[in-house]
Amino acid sequence: MKFLYFFAMGLTVVANVAYHFCQKAISPNANPLVSLFFTYLSGMLITLVCIPLFYPGLQIGSAVKELNWATFALGFGIVGLELGFLLAYRAGWNLSLGALYSNVMVTVLLLPIGVLVFKETLTGRHWVGLALALSGLILLGKQ
């Protein structure tokens, strides 16, 4: 369990770096929605290759029955996220700061959602960390 805990976060970090690097590197002449289409097509193909590697013998029909509304709603969130970053980078946001601004703002919005919807608890240390993150965001925004 401990391996999965750290591996999952490491994978998230590595994939996030690759994600932002590739978003910034997409040709400025490429149509954003066509680019997203082929991004999802490559992601779908990678997923189809990985399913039998990670879950040999998986019955797709049974697995599909376990899905709920959140899987499909996530599709809308992913399109918005990816289109938003693609357009932000085209509008001139720096790779080094664009994701930081976004992630701090997302964290501020997710805190009350985590507490109210998922009954997560926040300690004083968490609130201090949030204050420091917001302070850093303000300092980064100063010219």
Predicted feature locations:
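Non-cytosolic membrane-interface motifs at loop->transmembrane helix junctions
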Residues: 67, 97-100
